[in-house]
């Protein structure tokens, strides 16, 4: 039976989509999760997918907060993710500092959009317990929310959001890059390791065709992104540094054994 791989349809998924075209559903099928990492984690937990390519911070915080449904099994993107801070076209907010004590839009509980709001608060010196959130499911709901005033802002990947900004549906007021490599691979703890081992280009035309971005945006993004040479290793520092920031932001609490985050039958900690 082919592996079910959950993913978010963004430009970061281009290598996966290119491989899927070549594979033709022989060894894996793709399951799109438009709401992001929160939805990917939910589907892993509910046995709706076997593997997820998802954001580093929610995957790590999920395990740190007690999830036994999945383990980390590989690296996907080795560079940080640049999270844009976005508000409505006519909203009164013009900088990140204007957002203090306002409601921030997120896609789901435990999503990257929520985790990065905590990181933003940490950088701004705001108490994490003062943050208020409103769930808006996906980028379309988030944009609607900042324009109708029910939220002040939301956070989403810069280049994914740029077409909406170019169309004057919303505005950038800042950005917060992740202080860690941005994407990891996780698998259900019941997924056979051999399947993952066996089934484990920066192509402007491919991204143009599949995502409709202008060539200048694609070239700008390609200068900022890196993919690992070996997906079957994860640097111990990625997990410890991420946990350190998440602890300071109040997302996770306690001390952790790094080996409990990974499936060592599949991936090697280095």
Which residue ranges define each predicted feature?
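Extracytoplasmic/secreted proteins, especially bacterial periplasmic and envelope-associated proteins
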Residues: 39, 43, 112-119, 141, ...
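Short, glycine-/small- and polar/acidic-enriched structural segments
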Residues: 2-127, 133-134, 152-158, 169-179
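Short, low-complexity disordered leader/linker segments with a strong preference
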Residues: 1-2, 270
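Secondary-structure end/capping motifs
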Residues: 193-251
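Periplasmic-binding protein-like
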Residues: 77-87, 166-191, 259-270
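C-terminal solvent-exposed extensions
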Residues: 242-270
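Helix N-cap/coil-helix junction residues
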Residues: 67, 126-128, 212-213, 251-252
């Amino acid at each position: 039976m082919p592996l079910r791989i959950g993913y978010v349809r963004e430009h970061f998924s281009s290598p996966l989509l290119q491989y899927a075209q070549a594979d033709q559903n022989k060894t894996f099928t793709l399951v799109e999760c438009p709401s992001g990492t929160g939805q990917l984690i939910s589907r892993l937990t509910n046995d709706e997918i076997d593997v997820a390519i998802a954001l580093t911070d929610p995957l790590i915080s999920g395990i740190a907060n007690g999830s036994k449904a999945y383990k980390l099994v590989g690296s996907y993107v080795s560079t940080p993710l640049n999270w844009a801070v976005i508000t409505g076209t006519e909203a009164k907010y013009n900088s990140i500092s204007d957002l203090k004590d306002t409601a921030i839009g997120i896609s789901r509980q435990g999503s990257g959009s929520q985790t990065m709001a905590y990181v933003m608060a940490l950088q701004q010196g705001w108490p994490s317990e003062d943050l208020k959130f409103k769930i808006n499911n996906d980028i379309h709901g988030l944009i609607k929310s900042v324009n109708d005033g029910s939220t002040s802002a939301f956070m989403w990947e810069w280049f994914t959001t740029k077409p909406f900004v170019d169309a004057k549906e919303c505005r950038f007021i800042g950005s917060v890059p992740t202080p860690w490599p941005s994407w990891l691979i996780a698998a259900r703890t019941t997924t056979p390791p051999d399947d993952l081992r066996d089934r484990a280009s920066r192509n402007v035309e491919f991204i143009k065709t599949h995502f409709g971005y202008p060539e200048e945006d694609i070239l700008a993004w390609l200068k900022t992104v890196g993919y690992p040479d070996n997906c079957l290793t994860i640097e111990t520092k990625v997990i410890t540094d991420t946990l350190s920031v998440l602890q300071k932001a109040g997302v996770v609490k306690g001390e952790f054994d790094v080996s409990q985050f990974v499936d060592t039958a599949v991936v090697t900690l280095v």
